[in-house]
Every structure is written in structure tokens, then in C-alpha cells.
A protein has these predicted regions:
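A structural micro-motif
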Residues: 24, 75-77, 131
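A short acidic, glycine-rich active-site loop
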Residues: 47-61
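A conditional alpha-helix N-cap/helix-loop micro-motif detector
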Residues: 8, 60, 84-85, 115, ...
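Small/aliphatic-rich secondary-structure junction motif
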Residues: 1-47, 145-177
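A general structural detector for well-ordered alpha-helical segments in enzyme core domains, enriched
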Residues: 62, 66, 121, 125, ...
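Structural beta-alpha unit
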Residues: 7, 65-103, 110
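Gly/Ser-rich helix-loop-strand patches that form or flank binding pockets
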Residues: 17-21, 89-145
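General small-molecule cofactor/ligand-binding pocket signal
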Residues: 27-29, 78-82, 134
Length: 177
């Protein structure tokens, strides 16, 4: 879940849509980091820790508010808020712990400068996520077509384990949805 986008959460909407049709559970995850609350000059140790805990608590409350309508619809929804950086490592750590069947992430557009000089979380997840990753854009999806992006080179995975998992997952989703 993107804590900077209070209005729209496309990945949440898509995850709920898929969960309803597949009778799956959902976990909503926020990974947060703010350098001002981590060894910054603005706070002493105890005040810094209190500010960080307050931020994480507020995010947890907000996440529970997002989860409640899904729970009211009968879905099993858990929430998790984590602190750390880089964000993609925090997400991958939770994926390793939870072992989900599918991960949803909002697809965002980045400027040329951001693409050239920064390793954003989405790109890192595309490269490193050990389970199928569904990048979600705003707007309704009509479920008419599905496409799985595979790695034709397999430099890190000689047996193409993830590719086989992607094909199987996509075929299963196509039948289910």
C-alpha cells in the first residue's frame, strides 16, 4: 500500500477483486522509512523513537481503516506496517516470511531522471520478487486478457523456475477470474 496516496489504491482494489473471486486471504503491507526519523539532527534518541512509533501507529490505524470494508465483505485481511530501507528489501523480506501466491503493487510513472539515476521499488521488485508480481494501474480492469512477462535469458535461474510459476499462475488466474 502506498502511504503517500491517500485517495487511490489501485493495488488494493485489484487484490480485493481477485481475492473475492479466488476466495483468498489478503495482507496489506506498508513499508515506511523517513531519514529525519532515523539518526537525523532534529530529534534526540527518545524523541526520535517516539516520533517513529507515532508515525507507524498512525499508518497502522489508516491501514486498518482500508482493510475494514474488505473484512465487512467477508474477506480475510491482515495488515502489517514495517520500518526500514531500502523499501524493496523490506517488501522482499515480508514476501519471504509470508510466502504469498501473488504480490500486487501500484504501477507508477517515473520521470526520465528518476529512471536514470534511482533504483525505484517497482523495478527492484520486478527484478527480485520470487513470486508473481502484478503491477496495477488506476482504472477498471475488464479481465479480458492476461499477459505474463518472462525472462528469456535466465542468467540467474537456469531452470526457469520463476518462469514456470508465472505461466502456471497466469493460467490459473485466467481460469479463476
Amino acid at each position: 500500500i502506498d502511504p503517500t496516496s491517500k485517495d487511490s489504491q489501485p493495488s488494493l482494489e485489484r487484490a480485493a477483486w481477485v481475492a473475492k473471486r479466488s476466495q483468498s486471504a489478503v495482507e496489506l503491507l506498508i513499508c515506511e522509512y523517513n531519514s529525519a526519523l532515523d539518526g537525523g539532527f532534529f530529534f534526540d534518541g527518545p524523541a526520535q523513537q517516539k516520533a517513529r512509533e507515532s508515525l507507524l501507529n498512525n499508518l497502522s490505524i489508516w491501514l486498518d481503516k482500508l482493510a475494514q470494508p474488505l473484512r465487512d465483505d467477508g474477506l480475510t485481511v491482515t495488515t502489517e506496517v514495517r520500518w526500514g530501507k531500502p523499501l524493496h528489501s523490506m517488501v522482499l523480506q515480508r514476501i519471504d516470511e509470508l510466502k504469498p501466491d501473488l504480490v500486487f503493487r501500484d504501477a507508477t510513472t517515473h520521470s526520465l531522471l528518476q529512471r536514470l539515476f534511482f533504483n525505484n521499488t517497482s523495478w527492484q521488485l520486478i527484478r527480485q520478487c520470487p513470486v508473481p508480481l502484478w503491477l496495477v494501474r488506476k482504472g477498471e480492469w475488464k479481465a479480458e486478457r492476461m499477459c505474463a512477462a518472462l525472462d528469456p535469458v535466465h542468467s540467474a535461474d537456469t531452470e526457469a523456475v520463476l518462469d514456470h510459476l508465472l505461466v502456471e499462475s497466469t493460467a490459473h488466474l485466467a481460469k479463476t477470474l
